Amino acid sequence: PRHIEVQILAGKNNTVHLHERDCSVQRRHQKLIEETPSPDLNDEIRKELFDKTVKMVSKIGYEGAGTVEFIYEDEKFYFLEMNTRIQVEHPVTEMVTGIDIIKEQIWIAFSGETALKQSDINPRGHAIECRINAEDPSKNFQPSPGTIGMCHQPSGFRTRVDGAIFQGYKITPYYDSMVCKLICHGRNRTEAIQRMNRSLDEFVIEGVTTTIPLHKKLLNHEKFLKSDFNVSWHKKKKII
């Protein structure tokens, strides 16, 4: 199956969706790569998914930003959970919609209403996020704590890094292994992948082992390029 989720913003006045994210590239049931739009959905299936999601969220009277997650298989969706918070992968949605989800969440908390109508939301292009973790894929994703040496982050057109790492930054073994997120946007999926490849090549983090080399392999794998994968793809193929 695939892991598909829908970003929503809901207030007393109305509920809007910010389209879907595909989070099917995972390890240990945790996301590695997220993208939007999902390359596996058609417009008819999208409409059905969005309509049911908005109806569900409106029915329970939810207010704020949230994400409704589904398992998708054989053109059928199965409800998984709703996360009543900002997701790690929210930047891909921001990149394609141009909407600051944090700002909108604060506005809803302040006013009780959404400032957006569904007609205001018109996604453009394709965005991909890679979670950069301090862990060793060759050792079953063993954490790699330590002190960061040289650190050079990529930059450029439609490229975004969310994180706070720097030379001398200490990564402890006590918390989540993710150290930053790399997000790239393109006019289409091919361009987004190309931009992500360039950005990963530019990214330098010394002193600890990271998942940067793994992301390069995943992004350029034939199965990923053809969107022929599911939540167990990485484990079955043993890509490290």
Where are the regions a protein language model picked out?
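ATP-dependent carboxylate activation and anion-phosphoryl transfer catalytic cores
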Residues: P1-I240
